[in-house]
């Protein structure tokens, strides 16, 4: 049952890291 929440957390962290990387590229 916790697998779904764990995968969602990982995807969220992945998206956040991607956004931070894009922001750093712009700066």
UniProtKB/Swiss-Prot annotation:
Pfam families xref list: Hormone_2
Gene Ontology molecular functions: digestive hormone activity; hormone activity
Cited InterPro entries: Glucagon_GIP_secretin_VIP, Prosecretin
Main location: secreted
A cellular-component GO term for this protein: extracellular space
Location(s), subcellular: Secreted
Disulfide pattern: none
Record-listed Leucine amide modification sites: 27
A GO biological process held by the record: hippocampus development
Keyword terms of this UniProt record: Amidation, Hormone, Secreted
Stated role: Hormone involved in different processes, such as regulation of the pH of the duodenal content, food intake and water homeostasis. Exerts its biological effects by binding to secretin receptor (SCTR), a G-protein coupled receptor expressed in the basolateral domain of several cells. Acts as a key gastrointestinal hormone by regulating the pH of the duodenal content.
Family stated for the protein in its record: Belongs to the glucagon family.
UniProt name for this protein: Secretin
């Amino acid at each position: 049952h916790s697998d779904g929440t764990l995968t969602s957390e990982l995807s969220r962290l992945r998206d956040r890291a991607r956004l931070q990387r894009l922001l750093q590229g712009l700066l």
